[in-house]
Curated annotation (Swiss-Prot):
GO terms for molecular function: NADH dehydrogenase (ubiquinone) activity. Its main location: mitochondrion. Its EC number is 7.1.1.2. One of its GO terms (cellular component) is NADH dehydrogenase complex. It catalyses: a ubiquinone + NADH + 5 H(+)(in) = a ubiquinol + NAD(+) + 4 H(+)(out). It holds the Pfam family Oxidored_q4. Gene3D superfamilies: NADH:ubiquinone/plastoquinone oxidoreductase, chain 3. This is NADH-ubiquinone oxidoreductase chain 3. It comes from Formosania lacustris (Oriental stream loach). Belongs to the complex I subunit 3 family.
């Protein structure tokens, strides 16, 4: 236990020292050039905020969902070593079915179609 406390203390002290040094070291000389908006070396001609396509947002959300599904399924082979392996497989299958139904719903609603 003393080893854990000493490692924790060293970590806190080292991170505090690094945080204090990071505030002292940089040269903080903000001028008009550094405070102005920068867009690829040119002055912005119009609004820099373009409308974001909802299609990209939907694909990103679907990617996150199925990325989490893969993370869930990677640990599944070790699930048979648990006390109640049947329960583990039941809940993993339930999550897999739920995500599959969500994908089918998204597909039938046209969320994966790029052309209108």
């Amino acid at each position: 236990m003393n080893l854990v406390i000493s490692i924790l203390a060293i970590t806190i002290i080292l991170s505090s020292i690094l945080a204090v040094v990071s505030f002292w070291l940089p040269q903080m000389n903000p001028d008009a050039e550094k405070l102005s908006p920068y867009e690829c070396g040119f002055d912005p001609l119009g609004s820099a905020r373009l409308p974001f396509s909802i299609r990209f947002f939907l694909v990103a959300i679907l990617f996150l969902l199925f990325d989490l599904e893969i993370a869930l399924l990677l640990a599944l082979p070790w699930g048979d070593q648990l006390y109640s392996a049947t329960g583990t497989f039941f809940w993993a299958t339930a999550v897999l079915i739920l995500l599959t139904l969500g994908l089918i719903y998204e597909w039938t609603q046209g969320g994966l179609e790029w052309a209108e």
